[in-house]
Regions:
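Long, charged amphipathic helices and adjacent flexible linkers at domain junctions
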Residues: 1-10
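Short glycine-centered, acidic/aromatic-flanked micro-motifs in structured strand/loop junctions
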Residues: 9-12, 61-63
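C-terminal amphipathic alpha-helical interaction region
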Residues: 12-18
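Cofactor-cradling patches in redox/metallo enzymes
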Residues: 21-31, 35-106, 111-120
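A charged, well-structured terminal subsegment
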Residues: 118-130
Length: 130
């Protein structure tokens, strides 16, 4: 089997919750993805730099607090400028599909398996483009 694409994941700046992100990371790794976990409370610039360095086709962002959603939006804006190829999956208790659309995410994952299913779709496109 071809190696699956790189995925960068992080909990956005200002948010210290990482249980959900950690579950997504474990599942993605179980499905064969090469996951770079930047941790929690990660500034937008750090996330963008990692995606660019790895040329990662997938970024997963997590936020659990309503106060950190603007940080998620700022991260997405920066990614659109620095890494326009990257597909952005967002998740967390304070998010829903409508909000994910509003802040410019490509996909809202209501649970960890939703994130994995979308990553699998992106990986198929990525492999086809190689």
């Amino acid at each position: 089997t071809a190696k699956k694409c790189a995925v960068v994941i992080a909990t956005v700046h200002g948010d210290i919750h990482d249980i959900g992100k950690n579950i997504v990371k474990l599942l993605l790794e179980n499905y064969g993805f090469n996951v770079t976990d930047l941790g929690k409370d990660v500034p937008p610039e750090t996330i963008s730099a990692a995606v660019v360095k790895l040329h990662a086709p997938i970024l997963g962002l997590s936020a659990l607090m309503t106060t950190t959603v603007p940080s998620m939006e700022a991260t997405i804006k920066l990614l659109r400028k620095d890494a326009p190829w990257c597909k952005i999956i967002v998740g967390g208790a304070v998010l829903n599909k409508e909000y994910a659309d509003k802040i410019g995410a490509d996909k809202y994952a209501k649970d960890a398996m939703g994130a994995v299913r979308y990553a699998e779709e992106i990986n198929l496109q990525y492999q086809a483009d190689l």
